[in-house]
Amino acid sequence: GTRGDVLAYDSSGKISKISLGSSGQVLKSDGTDLVFGDLAGATNVYYVSKNGTDAAGRGGSIDSAWASIKYACSNLPVTPTKLAPAVIFVKSGTYEEAQLPIVVPEYTTIVGDNLRATTVKPAPGLDSGGSIVNKRSTLFRCSNGVIIQDLLCDGMDGYTPGSPGSDPTAGTLGGVYFALNAQSPITDKSPYIYNVTTFGNGATGAVVDGSLHSSGNRSMLFHTVTHIHSDGLGIWAKDNANAEIISGFTYYCQIGYTATGGSKIRSLNSSNSYGEY
């Protein structure tokens, strides 16, 4: 035999060998025989962890988790829907995501362990297009019905103010943490960013760009979101977009919250501190 293999009686009453399963799999009963497999998971619930592996057939349990959020979002085995949404739990650790952006599918929720446990950053190198430095790309492209919560995001940079400094259309954007997915108009539920803190010198918290969609609400919702961006930008709604900010805070930003091109921001219990505009 081979190390780790198990002997058991088969359907003929003879002793047969059960080969050792993959790392993280467990020996369990399928009701008839013993088999190695993943721990049973809930429908449409997936996991990313620091000891995970980005490979097909994984993600369905914490013991067979994926290793990156981008891989998880790009390889969900079932397309999420309004009646059958997906949840991706991102366990404690720092995740350096390569070849941004992460395009979050419709009706998908990304949940970190908490602000002090799960951190998401851009990896070194270029973005998926191969021409922009990864940290000056966009971290998350959010689709209709998306929720992102309980994360700390760090590492984006590159916003350069223009003249006048209060006008973002005169400046140059660098790295952005949250933006709309051009391929997914907001027809049902706005992307909902909840309990998230972002850091970064010259980073931009969110750009809600209404010009990406010819229909839908062109909207995002931010609840308990803090942006700490020295000389950066907090949230920019542009070109007939809509943003709602509840208990949101920016610190040290060149511009805290701004709406241009017919856009609207509704802000409750929020503030911009120690910045310029």
Model-derived features: positions:
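Extracellular repetitive beta-rich solenoid segments
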Residues: G1-N44, S64
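Acidic glycine-/aspartate-rich tracts in secreted/extracellular proteins
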Residues: S11-G13, G31-D33, N51-A56, G93-E96, ...
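Short, T/G/N/S-enriched strand-turn elements that build extracellular solenoid repeat scaffolds
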Residues: K17-S19, K70-K82, Y95-P105, T138-C142, ...
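Detector for repetitive beta-architecture
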Residues: D33, V45, P85-V87, S92-T94, ...
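Acidic Gly/Asp/Thr-rich repetitive segments characteristic of extracellular carbohydrate-active
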Residues: K50-V90
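Extracellular beta-strand-rich solenoid/capping regions of secreted or surface-exposed proteins
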Residues: P77-P80, E96-V111, T119-D150, D154-T187
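Residues in short coils/turns that link rungs of repeat/solenoid architectures in beta-rich domains
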Residues: A117, G155, F199-N201, G205, ...
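Right-handed parallel beta-helix
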Residues: I147-N240
